[in-house]
Swiss-Prot record:
A Gene Ontology cellular-component term: axon
Region described as Required for netrin-mediated axon repulsion of neuronal growth cones: spans on this chain: 402-931
Spans within the Extracellular topological domain: 41-380
Organism: Rattus norvegicus (Rat)
Gene: Unc5c
Protein name: Netrin receptor UNC5C
Stretches of the chain found on the membrane's Cytoplasmic side: 402-931
Length: 931
């Protein structure tokens, strides 16, 4: 009997003690109520049972081995839902909160050989009629509930839907005719269906695989992009949508890639068609470079050009009449001549035939012959000997003079070399022997430059209007020359020393120093206020340069999992780091580097810079430039002219631009005015000395680009110089109208002060401001007080562009002889945080962000997806950039984070999602601080 109980317990998955409590104890109660005889009969049975039962370990909750999965009813075919759990005494299905009848369950039960626990598997069948009979907003769903002695466990919900696929596409592709290498976009929105249809594209009935042909790209919302149209891309394209129910094809869109014809080069001019007189010449070209294809336009213009020509007629030469016979000569002949000039041959005409000279005997053969005289021969021999002797004497004298001069020349060279310490030989007199402190080493010498190099500007380039300089004078250039023996030339000023050195040597020194400055590592900035460093992993973070408007957002997931990068962002203030500017171009942002260069990124980082361009982009052509490894500046993208191949995206806000890039490099934003209405913002800041013990008092008016970093640099400079801010800085719109900036001072109390300005105003040339290449550009007004007792200064400063806008500053300051503390309120001392890492760097919590991406990345039939989010956030200028990313919503939210850093306006984001019909309550809770 005990064996039977154990077998029953094993089959049911129950412990022996539990089974005995359930079966034996009630039997004992019944037996005790019967007679004693019956009790005596069963004594043997109870004597066989132990007095106490061992306690089995507690049974675990049921664990689902198989949970029901979502299913689709195709046509009228029912679907089966399966569920398996262990240990489980019972499993039932609950559909739409109602229990499914026991008879509708198909149960399979077995014992796991390893654990000895009961494994129960249940299935039910769902018909189309059951699903259609459900009323309400929620889809038909079912879930399993499993029991054991320890309790119950519920499975996940499995939704059962009726599968279908509409016949009509919501948007079908349209045929296009495009030129060669143009980007092509074919749009397709598949029919509504459950489950959502998968989309593929056919090219002439062949499936397009973007992996095999990288010229094709299929976006996340099913559009087909041909990056650069080729002749082979001329074809019929079809959008195919399919799911488990059906397969639909859109109408065919024909893409024709045409080639406009181009002229070949002109052939050579033909010869004039007239051999005598007026005619014409012609040259031809053909429309074959390239020839028009697929309906491309034929070449415009003429294929033949003709010009008039005149060919001079040939003139044959004719003889003039014979001249008279000459007198009879010693040889008893006389002659006569004629010329071929009546007319002379011209333009290819024939020359005259015959003799030019004609001679004949003039004595009729009676001429006398004389023998040569011996005296004449002796005379000729004497002359030859005399000439030979003279030539020999001349050669000897010349050789002697040459050797003497050659020895003197070598001596001069040695002396010159000694004076110059091994430099190029120059002619220096003996009176200048005091130039060297010790005798130089003539065997080895070298030149070394010590000290800073400054650009040499002509005085005529400055603003010639007052004795108060607009720009502070540059320090003198000092150069030392060292030789191998340690002798040093005295420190002369630039003009004197340049006269001793050759121009080539001076230029070489300057160029070498500039090259050394250029090759310095970008990450080793000496000024920590211009650089931010940080260590980041896949959680991302933020790098901020305080008070500069420059930051770098590293989104979560941008750095590959398992990698750690030492990243930096730095502002370059040296002029040799700025890109070259053309006439109408201007620098709109500081030059900023981010690194490390070449780092592998899996999604774009966002570099934020303050810019000084007026928001009206129609007057601007704004382009992003980056500096290559060789130091050359290259164009990256023009705002408004992006295409599929552009590596960066620029979001231009009113005061900042956000650069989305996967390439860490050196960047700058350059603007080119397309109209004279284009304007850039200037920041006008006025400074004066913190203390003044003399009669003169200088006021400096800075005209800066309206960026935080430009003002920060001037504030730091003035703090070092002991200056103070006299008035709150003001902005000025400076138009590209080629008009100068005019500065003037008014309403001075003449009984206390007098201006040393000779003219009524000062002007800064237009191009000095517009190019943006001159840092810390300022103008100085020097006032003189008539007495040291005068401590109050009241005046007005007017700064305006000629025929443009202006600003007026009302100054009312106290002149102190004792220095006081420098107060620069525009530099926020609390802004010392440069690095924020991990989730704390972002406003949107990571779980909420993941939910938003999963719900908005997939295209929706009503458009309530990432495209509408971009439109609501005003980030929809070029949606194709986001469409090429694996998670468009994630990139849009990254850009929103960069725009709203550091505050983060989550309530605004929640309101946008509410307008889209996305009731993201978690975002609302986070906006209210309840997350």
């Amino acid at each position: 009997m005990r064996k039977g109980l154990r077998a029953t317990a094993a089959r049911c998955g129950l412990g022996l003690g539990y089974l005995l409590q359930m079966l034996v104890l009630p039997a004992l109660a019944l037996l005790s109520a019967s007679g004693t005889g019956s009790a005596a009969q069963d004594d043997d049975f109870f004597h066989e049972l132990p007095e106490t039962f061992p306690s089995d370990p507690p049974e675990p909750l049921p664990h689902f081995l198989i949970e029901p999965e979502e299913a689709y009813i195709v046509k009228n075919k029912p679907v089966n839902l399966y569920c398996k759990a262990s240990p489980a005494t019972q499993i039932y299905f609950k559909c739409n909160s109602e229990w499914v009848h026991q008879k509708d369950h198909v149960v399979d039960e077995r014992v796991d050989e390893t654990s000895g626990l009961i494994v129960r598997e249940v299935s039910i069948e769902i018909s189309r009629q059951q699903v259609e009979e459900l009323f309400g907003p929620e889809d038909y769903w079912c879930q399993c509930v499993a029991w054991s002695s320890a309790g119950t466990t519920k499975s996940r919900k499995a939704y059962v839907r009726i599968a279908y696929l509409r016949k009509t596409f919501e948007q079908e592709p349209l045929g296009k005719e495009v030129s060669l290498e143009q980007e092509v976009l074919l749009q397709c929105r598949p029919p509504e269906g459950i489950p959502m249809a998968e989309v593929e594209w056919l090219k002439n009935e062949d499936i397009i695989d973007p992996v095999e042909d990288r010229n094709f790209y299929i976006t996340i919302d099913h559009n087909l992009i041909i990056k650069q149209a080729r002749l082979s891309d001329t074809a019929n394209y079809t959008c195919v949508a399919k799911n488990i129910v059906a397969k639909r094809k859109s109408t065919t869109a024909t893409v024709i890639v045409y080639v406009n014809g181009g002229w070949s080069t002109w052939a050579e001019w033909s010869v004039c068609n007239s051999r005598c007189g007026r005619g014409y010449q012609k040259r031809t070209r053909t429309c074959t470079n390239p020839a028009p294809l697929n309906g491309g336009a034929f070449c415009e213009g003429q294929s033949v050009q003709k010009i008039a020509c005149t060919t001079l007629c040939p003139v044959d030469g004719r003889w003039t009449s014979w001249s008279k016979w000459s007198t009879c000569g010693t040889e008893c002949t006389h002659w006569r001549r004629r010329e071929c000039t009546a007319p002379a041959p011209k333009n290819g005409g024939k020359d005259c035939d015959g003799l030019v000279l004609q001679s004949k005997n003039c004595t009729d053969g009676l001429c006398m012959q004389a023998a040569p005289d011996s005296d004449d021969v002796a005379l000729y021999v004497g002359i030859v000997i005399a000439v030979t002797v003279c030539l020999a004497i001349t050669v000897v004298v010349a050789l002697f003079v040459y050797r003497k001069n050659h020895r003197d020349f070598e001596s001069n060279i040695i002396d010159s070399s000694a004076l110059n310490g091994g430099f190029q030989p120059v002619n220096i007199k003996a009176a200048r022997q005091d130039l060297l402190a010790v005798p130089p080493d003539l065997t080895s010498a070298a030149a070394m430059y010590r000290g800073p190099v400054y650009a040499l500007h002509d005085v005529s380039d400055k603003i010639p209007m007052t004795n108060s300089p607009i720009l502070d004078p540059l320090p003198n250039l000092k150069i030392k020359v060292y030789n191998s023996s340690g002798a040093v030339t005295p420190q002369d000023d630039l003009a004197e020393f340049s006269s001793k050195l050759s121009p080539q040597m001076t230029q070489s020194l300057l160029e070498n120093e500039a090259l050394n400055l250029k090759n310095q590592s970008l990450a080793r900035q000496t000024d920590p206020s211009c650089t931010a460093f940080g260590t980041f992993n896949s959680l991302g973070g933020h790098l901020i340069i305080p008070n500069s408007g420059v930051s770098l957002l590293i989104p979560a997931g941008a750095i590959p999992q398992g990698r750690v990068y030492e990243m930096y962002v730095t502002v370059h203030r040296k002029e040799n780091m700025r890109p070259p500017m053309e006439d109408s171009q201007t620098l709109l942002t500081p030059v900023v580097s981010c690194g490390p260069p070449g780092a592998l990124l899996t999604r774009p980082v966002i570099l934020t810079l303050h810019h000084c361009a007026d928001p009206n982009t129609e007057d601007w052509k704004i382009q992003l430039k980056n500096q290559a490894v060789q130091g050359q500046w290259e164009d990256v993208v023009v705002v408004g002219e992006e295409n599929f191949t552009t590596p960066c995206y620029i979001q231009l806000d009113a005061e900042a631009c956000h650069i989305l890039t996967e390439n860490l490099s050196t960047y700058a934003l350059v603007g080119q005015s397309t109209t004279k209405a284009a304007a850039k913002r200037l920041k006008l800041a006025i400074f004066g000395p913190l203390c003044c013990s003399s009669l003169e008092y200088s006021i400096r008016v800075y005209c800066l680009d309206d960026t935080q970093d430009a003002l920060k640099e001037v504030l730091q400079l003035e703090r070092q110089m002991g200056g103070q801010l006299l008035e709150e800085p003001k902005a000025l719109h400076f138009k590209g109208s080629i008009h100068n900036l005019r500065l003037s001072i008014h309403d001075i109390t003449h009984s206390l002060w007098k201006s040393k300005l000779l003219a009524k105003y000062q002007e800064i040339p237009f191009y000095h401001i517009w190019s943006g290449s001159q840092r810390n550009l300022h103008c100085t007004f020097t006032l003189e007080r008539l007495s040291l007792n005068t401590v109050e200064l009241v005046c007005k400063l007017c700064v305006r562009q000629v025929e443009g806008e202006g600003q007026i500053f009302q100054l009312n300051c106290t002149v102190s002889e004792e220095p006081t503390g420098i107060d620069l309120p525009l530099l926020d001392p609390a802004s010392t945080i440069t690095t924020v890492t991990g989730p704390s760097a972002f406003s949107i919590p990571l779980p909420i962000r993941q939910k938003l991406c999963s719900s908005l990345d997939a295209p929706q039939t009503r458009g309530h997806d990432w495209r509408m989010l971009a439109h609501k956030l005003n980030l929809d200028r070029y949606l194709n950039y986001f469409a090429t990313k694996s998670s468009p919503t994630g990139v849009i939210l990254d850009l929103w984070e960069a725009q709203n850093f550091p505050d983060g306006n989550l309530s605004m984001l929640a309101a946008v999602l509410e307008e889209m019909g996305r009731h993201e309550t978690v975002v609302s809770l986070a906006a209210e601080g309840q997350y």
